[in-house]
């Protein structure tokens, strides 16, 4: 059971993001120019829609695992409860927010067309994260589990707002 959580938390997001980074890297110079890891340089190149349809979901899920996107949120409560309190607070306050930042800065920034077309799928998943995290936090007795599930709910709300793709959200 712990091995499955470790896979979701460690190997899955890293693998998905690595595949996308390499795919974008090798497509960053379609005319034979210099390839780059600079996100501003890559953003100047139009990634083909077929590639965006593959890369956007992989990138969003990869970073979404860090942001406790449903159904990949299961690592978070166990991580919070087994960690020392200070680490648990850093985990909730920093690590999980990096998932949302990665979704925004990489997935949506580099692949906005696919983000507009496919966002409804992830809006459903983030809505489930918000509701499931909130109701799970309500029924918990352990403070660390309350923090963990409320963080799942909060990060779901952050990802939901990012997927709205407007300044108000």
Q: Where are the predicted features?
A:
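Hydrophobic transmembrane alpha-helices and their helix-loop junctions in integral membrane proteins
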Residues: 13-169
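Short, small-residue-biased leader/transition segments that mark boundaries at the very start
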Residues: 1, 5-12
């Amino acid at each position: 059971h712990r091995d499955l959580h470790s896979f979701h938390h460690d190997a899955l997001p890293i693998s998905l993001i690595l595949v996308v980074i390499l795919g974008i890297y090798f497509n960053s110079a379609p005319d034979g120019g210099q390839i780059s890891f600079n996100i501003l340089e890559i953003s100047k190149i139009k990634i083909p829609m077929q590639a965006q349809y593959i890369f956007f979901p992989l990138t969003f899920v990869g970073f979404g695992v860090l942001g406790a996107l449903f159904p990949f949120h299961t690592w978070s409560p166990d991580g919070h409860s087994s960690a020392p309190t200070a680490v648990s607070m850093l985990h909730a306050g920093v690590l999980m927010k990096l998932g949302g930042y990665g979704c925004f800065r990489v997935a949506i920034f580099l692949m906005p067309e696919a983000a507009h077309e496919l966002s409804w799928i992830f809006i459903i998943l983030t809505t489930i994260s918000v509701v499931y995290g909130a109701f799970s936090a309500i029924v918990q007795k352990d403070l660390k589990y309350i923090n963990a599930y409320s963080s799942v709910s909060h990060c779901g709300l952050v990802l939901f707002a990012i997927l709205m793709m407007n300044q108000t959200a």
